[in-house]
Swiss-Prot record:
NCBIfam families: hypA, PRK03681.1, PRK12380.1. It holds the Pfam family HypA. GO terms for biological process: protein maturation; protein modification process. This is Hydrogenase maturation factor HypA. It comes from the Bacteria.
Length: 117
């Protein structure tokens, strides 16, 4: 279950950023998940709750957004978007000579904090 490892790394980054900004608590986190990242969102949600325990992010609200796959089609020389991992054909020319440009990871997009007074 690589979701646990991803969450552990995300919490490290979240804690680091929260401390740099003088946070006493992280209240919400927005993560973007790539369409081809092979991340199961329900597992990610469960693991995130576990790794947040006894951190500044404990009890925070997790918002997940599924990113579409951005690809380059070598057949028609177009930048295209794939909507699901099951469809690996260019929506423009139906070619299968695609290179994934962006979408295979997980990114911390935003976080809300309560600052110390």
């Amino acid at each position: 279950m690589h979701e646990l490892t991803l969450c552990q790394r995300a919490i490290e980054i979240i804690e680091q950023q929260a401390q740099q900004h003088g946070a006493k608590k992280v209240t919400a986190v927005w993560l973007e998940i790539g369409a081809f990242s092979c991340v199961e969102t329900s597992s990610l949600d469960f693991c995130f709750g576990m790794v947040c325990r006894r951190t500044l992010a404990e009890g925070c609200q997790l918002h997940l957004h599924q990113q579409e796959a951005e690809c380059w089609c070598y057949d028609c020389q177009q930048s295209v978007t794939l909507l699901t991992i099951q469809v690996r054909r260019c929506p423009q020319c139906q070619g299968d000579n695609l290179r994934i440009v962006a979408d295979d990871g997980i990114q911390l997009k935003r976080m809300e904090i309560e600052q110390e007074i």
